[in-house]
Amino acid sequence: MKRSGPFFHDVSQENLYLKSELSRCHKLISELEASYFHQKNNKLLKENTDMKEKLQQLSAELTHMSTKEKHASHTSQTLHQIRAELLDKIVVLQELLSAETYKRRAEIEEKHKLHIAKVKIEEENKNLHKRISELQASIEQEQNALLQAKQQAELIKAENGRLKEQMVEKEYQLKHIKIEVDHMKDRIIETKERLLDIEKTKEKLFHETIISYKRQLDESDAWIASHFADIDGGTKQKEKTEEEAPAAYAQPNHVETILEDVTKQIHVLQKQLAHAQSSDQAKSHTIEELKNRAAEEKPYQKWVYKLNLEKENKPSQKKPQ
């Protein structure tokens, strides 16, 4: 009777079950061949030999009795009795032969049934071997696919680590550039304040120069008026005027020198301001490029991290920081 195997979720357990069933069938066949057929055949051979010996013995007795009948002078009653006994023995022998024939037929039918069962078991064994081979090939394919998935997961993990390192480096560079931009903005503000102070100083010096020119003109007018009013005291006044005139002309020259220095400093500061603004624009452009690049790289990093988690057992939805 064919046994139905249990339902297994694991292929290895199913293989073990099929192998155990196959071994059990082989063992059953071996036991049947070793115990039943061999012993029964020996028994039948022995019984057949015994029956032949009995038949030969009865034949010898019959021959002996026939000889006795020819040579002896027995009565007809004794002869009939002997014949009746012989007939009874022959009937018994025929019954034994019929029973033996029936047994042999039954044994032949049983052997035929066992042979059919053996053929079925061998066919089932072939199917089981074929099924085991298919399962083994499927297991090898699954193992190869699993190995490839693990290798791909390792590559993705390494790529994820590399991208994280790049992001850390880019963030550090961006932070450093922001610090430099802040310093540059502070320097620009400081330069603007210095320019404003210089403009104020220039206006103040210009105002003081105009006042000084006005005061000198007033003094010159007063001096000319007093000169024409007092021509007689010309010698002393002339000497005094000659002494004061260089001093009056020297002061405007000193003011012009100061104004030229201030103008040069203003030009230098303007150049520094223009250079700082140009550098600020370049760094702002660099910062924008880094921000755009970071915005482009972050979705790729998120996708790689999610793909790495999907290769694990039931991953949770997690975003990289």
Swiss-Prot record:
Top-level taxon of the source organism: Bacteria
Residue numbers spanned by region Disordered: 234-253, 274-293
GO term, biological process aspect, one: sporulation resulting in formation of a cellular spore
Keywords noted in UniProt: Coiled coil, Sporulation
Induction context: Transcription starts around hour 2 of sporulation and requires sigma-E.
Regions annotated as coiled coil: 37-70, 108-205
Basic and acidic residues bias locations: 234-243, 282-293
Disulfide bonds: none
Record's protein name: Sporulation protein cse15
The organism of origin for this protein: Bacillus subtilis (strain 168)
